[in-house]
């Protein structure tokens, strides 16, 4: 409930902000902003938003009322990104988040944000069951929406995630999360993706993910702060909290963590390759190799990939939008004739590719 105040405070400190979101309340926050700044100059964009079904008549009335205070809204800024969680195209993403319609809302929120003038990034986690070709199609589709960049990271079986997986989904972590070797196989083409799409992550980190080099973790470089204080040693693992960042730096024995020369100093670190630990290593020159500095300079200041308009051809809405969501499949199973259950005769299941076609599998 205090996210707006937090964002305004961080902006006053001159910080770059990524608002990580599942997209569900994003359009509401942007309507609040529009109401806070409304004047007649906004009418062309309001008309476009309404024509594109991104706001409705009720929203127009609210926006034109001009009620919210400017100090309590999230305004566009060159220092701020909406960072929308998207783990695949419609069928896959809705399945992972266990709620149909979320992908559609994410896309609507992204489109609305770009019309208003926000910067938008996406955040994707790759799991053992992730179809890499679908991730490429997802990037292509999102690029056609002129998303500004993408963060992508391997799923890692840290303690909180493992407990949630068992409790919420009834799945064993080893069936969902990846080993280091699996991560390298999934990310083998990440540098090719970076040529076509704007991938947020240093070239050195991308080489690490694809198995072309090793890096040591710099967990202290992207720290986590929550209501209990500075969390150590990292976002995934909690061995303690500290009142100040310097106190955390001084008191944590950083040599106890990470993987060095193939040896996991802490067993919890064994399969971790996530960006919050290793991406800063690429930026700071940890385990530096000849040419790394030039790679980073080119990445930060060189030309960026242009929007991939061909991505609009991807059939992104391949789930509940065409009545083939996971809940539709469950309803079909429940409503099957009793005879089919007794005889074992069933309609063949369908698997859906990222292009929206259906392949029959027996």
Locate the predicted segments by residue:
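Short, solvent-exposed turn/loop segments enriched in Gly/Ser/Thr/Pro and often Arg
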Residues: 1, 22, 153-156, 277-278
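Residues at alpha-helix caps and immediate loop-helix transition turns in enzyme cores, especially N-
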Residues: 2-3, 29-30, 134-138
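N-terminal active-site wall of soluble small-molecule enzyme domains
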Residues: 2-10
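Radical SAM enzyme [4Fe-4S]-AdoMet core and its adjacent flexible, acidic
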Residues: 9, 13-16, 43-46, 50-52, ...
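Internal, charge-rich low-complexity segments
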Residues: 22-56
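Ligand-binding grooves and catalytic loops that recognize ribose/phosphate and carbohydrate rings
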Residues: 35, 39, 63-64, 72-74, ...
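Flexible mid-to-C-terminal extensions adjoining Fe-S/redox cofactors in radical SAM and related proteins
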Residues: 231-362
């Amino acid at each position: 409930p205090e996210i707006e105040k937090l964002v305004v405070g961080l902006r006053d400190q001159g910080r770059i902000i990524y608002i990580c979101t599942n997209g569900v309340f994003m359009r509401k926050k942007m309507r609040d902003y529009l109401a806070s700044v409304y004047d007649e100059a906004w009418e062309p964009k309001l008309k476009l938003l309404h024509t594109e079904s991104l706001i409705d008549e009720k929203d127009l009335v609210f926006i034109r009322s001009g009620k919210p205070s400017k100090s309590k809204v999230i305004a566009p800024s060159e220092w701020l990104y909406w960072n929308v969680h998207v783990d695949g195209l419609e069928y896959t993403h809705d399945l992972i988040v266990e709620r149909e319609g979320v992908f559609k809302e994410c896309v609507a929120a992204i489109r609305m944000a770009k019309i208003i003038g926000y910067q938008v990034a996406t955040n994707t986690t790759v799991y053992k069951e992730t179809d890499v070709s679908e991730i490429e199609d997802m990037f292509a589709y999102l690029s056609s929406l002129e998303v500004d960049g993408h963060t992508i990271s391997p799923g890692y079986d840290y303690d909180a995630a493992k407990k949630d997986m068992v409790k919420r989904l009834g799945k064993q972590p080893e069936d969902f999360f990846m080993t280091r070797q699996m991560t390298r196989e999934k990310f083998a083409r990440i540098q090719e993706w970076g040529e076509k799409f704007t991938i947020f992550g240093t070239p050195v980190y991308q080489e690490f993910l694809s198995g072309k080099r090793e890096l040591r973790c710099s967990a202290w470089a992207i720290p986590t702060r929550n209501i209990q204080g500075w969390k150590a040693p990292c976002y995934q693992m909690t061995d303690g909290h500290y009142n100040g960042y310097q106190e955390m730096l001084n008191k944590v024995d950083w040599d106890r963590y990470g993987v060095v020369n193939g040896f996991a100093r802490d067993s919890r670190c064994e399969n971790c390759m996530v960006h919050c630990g290793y991406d800063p290593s690429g930026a700071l020159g940890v385990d530096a190799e000849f040419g790394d500095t030039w790679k980073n300079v080119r990445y930060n200041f060189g030309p960026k990939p242009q929007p991939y308009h061909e991505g609009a051809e991807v059939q992104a809405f391949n789930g509940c939008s065409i009545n083939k969501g996971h809940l539709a499949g469950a309803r079909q199973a429940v409503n099957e004739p009793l005879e089919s259950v007794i005889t074992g005769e069933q309609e063949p299941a369908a698997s859906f590719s990222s292009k929206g076609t259906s392949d029959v599998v027996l």
